[in-house]
């Protein structure tokens, strides 16, 4: 029996590289800010708001944003990059099926809702003075 693996496979890796090429072309076309390699991502800043979703979009190994490129957010986006590598071109389909609400989207939950800016960071309660 021939079994075709679609995740963590040469097929998904090809999809990841295709998405990275598309993300790179889109970022190169529209970015007006610095283009940097940070946390394993090609980060395109200065993008017009209509060229990406929410605070930024990870497409393959590229992160597209206007200026939302802090270290915490890039850690979140690095998880999305790993998801692109695992699922390849299945990732955008699976992401849409998971839903647009980040609080219920398994991919956003895996990447970290706090790091992605979807929920406020919890503050530690202050201890009463003795």
Protein language model features and the residues they cover:
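A structural signal for well-ordered alpha-helical segments within the folded catalytic domains
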Residues: 12, 16-19, 72, 105, ...
């Amino acid at each position: 029996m021939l079994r075709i693996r679609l995740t963590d496979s040469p097929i998904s890796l090809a999809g990841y590289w295709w998405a990275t090429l598309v993300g790179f072309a889109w970022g190169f076309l529209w970015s007006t800010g610095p283009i940097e390699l940070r946390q394993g991502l090609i980060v395109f800043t200065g993008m017009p708001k209509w060229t990406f979703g929410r605070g930024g979009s990870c497409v393959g190994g590229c992160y597209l944003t206007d200026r939302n490129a802090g270290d915490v957010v890039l850690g979140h986006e690095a998880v999305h990059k790993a998801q692109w590598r695992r699922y390849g071109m299945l990732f955008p389909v699976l992401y849409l099926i998971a839903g647009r609400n980040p609080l219920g989207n398994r991919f956003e939950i895996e990447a970290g809702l706090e790091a992605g800016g979807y929920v406020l960071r919890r503050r530690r309660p202050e201890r009463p003075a003795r």
